[in-house]
């Protein structure tokens, strides 16, 4: 369940465990959905299925907004910790400084969120590499079309180089 950005302001300052678990549950759910979308996007990019990529874009954008909302909630929670004179460097530090009834559950959620964040980084990098490879391929195709597949010699005088059939209709 994703909360409104100002929901943290309405929480009691002593209800740290609920605030942490709610935030982490929302974050984990959003991260899992984003991993699935990025996997589907990777498959679509490799197969050059533009229709699938377009279909995935709105959901990916919504998940990005949800991740941003989780980040904002995290920042609000850490700001509340700061005002309560609790450690505010990160959620793990905060969780170690407040009494938790389900400490193992909170620690497991923190660990899972950290692991999924790493997976999201790797999947995003993979997709970026695929996109760059596709752009390079398109660039090479355009170069071949415009030059007729022939490049100008590095050394040589008065050497005729084909301009390509798009540019001068000679090829």
State what each model feature region is.
Residues 2-94:
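Extended, charge-rich alpha-helical scaffolding segments
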